[in-house]
Amino acid sequence: QQVPCDTFDNAVLAMRAKNPSNDREFPMYWEMKRIAPGESNTFFFSAIGMTGGVRFSTKNPAVYHTFALRNGEQVWSEIQPGHVTNWPVITGHIFEFGFPDALLQMWAAYFAEREGKLGDRFGCATVAEVVNSHKAFAAAMKSHETRSEISI
């Protein structure tokens, strides 16, 4: 017997966001896939503009892709930088970066941020960022339910 599912398997959120420095709007798309054939706990990041962009996936963390517009042609390049961590590691850059390394980097960022020693490195997700993420997903659910645009 099938059980009704009350969650979304896959979702695409199409939004408009404003640049706070000049109030210009730009399109923003968030895509979530709970069911993604061939993927297992894979995170993707993609930022594509009119003349450039970047793509990254945890499925192949040793590379990232860049997009550029050159002489009217769209050019994608694959960059293999090796890994350079924000915080020193015992194994160094000649070995493959793995889950334990990622976990230690997260802990290092947390404690550095807590002690005010983060410097120019990325910090942990803030409470405000989490709240805003929940607002976006709640608006998406309401938009789906009402078949209308929801302002946040």
Can you name each region flagged by the protein language model?
Residues 1-68, 104-118, 138-141, 152:
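Contiguous beta-strand/loop segments that form the cofactor/metal-binding neighborhood of enzyme cores
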Residues 2, 93-101:
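A short glycine-threonine-serine/GTX helix/turn-capping micro-motif
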Residues 85-94:
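Short, charged, low-complexity loops and linkers
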Residues 113-132:
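Glycine- and charged-residue-rich phosphate/anionic-cofactor binding loop of Rossmann-like
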Residues 127, 131, 145-152:
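C-terminal lid/capping helical subdomain adjacent to the catalytic/cofactor pocket in oxidative enzymes
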Residues 130-142:
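C-terminal hydrophobic helical "lid"/dimerization subdomain
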